[in-house]
Regions:
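Conserved hydrophobic/aromatic beta-strand scaffold that supports enzyme active sites
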Residues: 42-44, 55-57, 76, 96-98, ...
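A short, N-terminal "cap"/entry segment at the start of jelly-roll beta-barrel domains
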Residues: 3-51, 132-136
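Residue-level marker of beta-strand positions
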Residues: 65, 95-96, 114
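Ligand-binding loop in jelly-roll beta-barrel domains
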Residues: 40, 101-126
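Short histidine-centered beta-strand/loop micro-motifs
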Residues: 46, 56-58, 67-71, 88-89, ...
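Short, charged/polar surface micro-motifs in flexible loops or helix N-caps
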Residues: 50-52, 61-64, 85, 103, ...
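Short acidic-glycine-tyrosine-enriched beta hairpin
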Residues: 85-109
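Glycine- and acidic-residue-biased ligand/ion/polar-headgroup-sensing regions
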Residues: 61-64, 70-86
Length: 136
């Protein structure tokens, strides 16, 4: 069997499964890890190490901000709790937004947020101390 490039990083037990078996993830067993932006943490639920495709949960502290970045490919976000704001509008709990490749913005969470995001490729920060860094 060949080694799969699609993984849930830091989750135990998947390595022993056959290639075509479903990968069930107990999200509570995953640790939150810091992102380059203060006050925003993430749990990677699924990541394709070859293509960059990723599904992740993000926890935003009240007042935290994701600095100016570009969505290199399609990005999708569903807000589970709280709300996210950018210059185009606000997305609240229970709602969904998708952004086309090439879209650029900052985003912030005045009251905090818990979101689920799906990326075909990681975001790239465009300015400040994180310029050129991928979000992963």
């Amino acid at each position: 069997e060949t080694e799969m490039a699609v993984v849930t990083p830091l989750f135990k037990g998947h390595d022993e499964l056959p290639d075509h078996a479903s990968r069930f993830v107990d999200v509570d067993q995953l640790d939150w890890k810091p992102t380059p932006c203060e006050g925003i943490e993430m749990k990677i639920l699924m990541e394709d190490e070859e293509t960059g495709m990723m599904t992740a949960m993000f926890k935003w502290a009240p007042g935290s901000k994701l600095t100016f970045h570009e969505h290199v490919e399609l990005e999708q976000t569903f807000v589970l709790e709280g709300s996210l704001v950018d210059d185009e509008g606000t997305i609240t709990a229970g709602n969904y937004v998708w952004r086309p490749p090439g879209s650029q913005h900052d985003a912030w969470a005045p009251d905090g947020a818990l979101i689920l995001s799906m990326f075909l490729k990681p975001n790239i920060f465009l300015d400040g101390e994180n310029k050129g860094v991928q979000l992963k």
